[in-house]
């Protein structure tokens, strides 16, 4: 049974909030769009889990894009998610990548770009150097500098029942200032004991009971996480008519068709000479109507 859910919870007596995300299909769809080496799959998985955890903090309609850029074998890895937990992602890489490649071996000298885009309002963008030993530490550093809130992330990737899974947890001190450092460290130590198979295979309620049965935990309604690309034949056609007609005709003459490929979901859209003629005719008639 597919398990793609985000759970928010609150420690009632400790002024600490938490999140738990468990992903299978949503993660599998992202990494199946290309033949990614295992370390790149894992990198996308960690970025996906982090994006899902961060979008849960949005207090408005909008989206968060997490983008890794570097001069290593992986030049780009990006995940986009919105407040409805619709996610998509892609990575670009070159050359051979070792099975045990670390974050810094994958990205080289790189940085993390965090872009928050409200539906209404100004966009915010933060840039963080990849200074931590792993991606979780990079995000923890971001929270410490940008929000001054103690935050811990756990990002887990692995196989469960023969399929790739991704999961993660987040703990964060509430901004009311009443939480103690000892309380937070206590919860960190408990969360450190979680095993991958528990995160991948147990219901959220069981995970939280397994970790925090001595604490009062309020669990909120779950939110589904869904892979959503948004590409379509219509959008691809709209992109074609922005290209010079002579250039499009040259491609049709040489290739017999013009193809647009979606990096996010792997779908290809093919247009032959008749399709292209119709596209430009519709675009021209549309412009005439406007004028």
From Swiss-Prot:
GO terms for molecular function: protein folding chaperone; unfolded protein binding. It is found in: Cytoplasm. The keyword Lipid biosynthesis does not apply. Pfam families: HSP33. Belongs to the HSP33 family. Redox regulated molecular chaperone. Protects both thermally unfolding and oxidatively damaged proteins from irreversible aggregation. Plays an important role in the bacterial defense system toward oxidative stress. This is 33 kDa chaperonin. It comes from Aliivibrio fischeri (strain ATCC 700601 / ES114) (Vibrio fischeri).
